Amino acid sequence: MKKSFLTLAFCCFAYIGFAQCDFKGYEVKAENAYTNYNVRWATGPEDAKHYTTERLRKEYLIEKVFAPGEVNWTYTLYDRFLIGGAEPTNAPLKLTSIAPLYGDESKGTSGRNLLDNRELGIINIGGEGTVTVDGKSYDLGFQEALYIGRGAKEIVVSSKNVAEPAKFYMNSACAQTSYPTKKVTLKEAKNIKAGKMEESNDRVIHQMIIDGVA
């Protein structure tokens, strides 16, 4: 739920790795022509003690977040959390639901929307783009965020300049309550100064989607 979970900060990539390796991870499946997903199961603490480096990478490293013209999701059984990236180029991309959210992948997603029982946080880390939610458009520049509440039916993302496409990093969790869709700029974020220069960790944490902000 939003009040306990959806905090999008610019340190959000702690869960994501962009390094390349030859090790084959979890199977990637296609939901439609441009939407891909993979599923990560929860890890037993005793099992994790015996993981090799390759196994750790398989379980916890998300290598493919962004790809031109694609939406890529990783669905983890930890809190049924979704981590994803959308990079629209020549055409807008509609955010559709994915089969594993419903337990039985064989039943498909016909008649279902991504946010029927979920909420979504988006932050743009690329060029200028637009997120259209049920017909209402929100322009997102670099480091601007959008919270989308439970129940939204149609979400479409697009880039304003194909040469510099938007890159929408996304988090989604289950939700029992609907909150209004809201755009958040960097200036409107809860900005927290942390660390010290002498300890090489001086930084500012920008909390974009958090209770009291969005």
Regions found by a protein language model. Give the residues of each.
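Short, surface-exposed loop/turn motifs at beta-strand boundaries within globular domains
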Residues: 74-76, 116, 214
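Surface-exposed beta-loop interaction hotspot
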Residues: 158-214
